[in-house]
Design a protein with these regions (language model features):
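Sec-dependent bacterial lipoprotein signal peptides
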Residues: 1-18
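Extracytoplasmic copper-binding redox domains, predominantly the cupredoxin/blue-copper superfamily
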Residues: 2, 19-121
Length: 121
């Protein structure tokens, strides 16, 4: 190997070593916190997950809306059915309390076919 090739190889190795491995002056980026228990996420893939979500009577359910706007309209309104979540909700989480046992089906009026349910024990 010529002297020129060795110098070039050493330079490349030093440059590569300088590019990786460190966290930089700002430290490492921590992972996002896990979603709270009893959360229904409205995904960018136009699905509610998990589906169904099973909870105990009296528990809160958090509907987490990401960057894509969604809403929640319950299919069977009634005294025990929580209030709908109207509008175009994005980057926000909204809670509803389920006080009576049963299956509560809901859908997004913005995205036809996007539906989910909460089963209350």
């Amino acid at each position: 190997m010529s002297r020129k090739t060795r110098i070039l190889s050493a330079f490349v190795l030093i440059a590569l070593a300088a590019c990786g491995g460190g966290t930089g002056p700002y430290g490492s980026k921590s992972p996002p916190p896990p979603p709270p228990a009893n959360t229904v996420a409205a995904t960018a893939g136009l699905a509610f997950t998990p589906n169904p979500l099973t909870v105990n009577s009296g528990e809160n359910v958090t509907f987490a809306f990401g960057a894509v706007a969604h809403n929640v309209t319950f299919d069977t309104p009634g005294a025990a059915t929580p209030a709908d979540i109207p509008g175009n909700n994005s980057n926000v989480s909204i809670q509803r309390t389920f006080t009576t046992s049963g299956t509560y089906r809901f859908h997004c009026t913005i995205h036809p076919g996007m539906a989910g349910s909460v089963v209350v024990r």
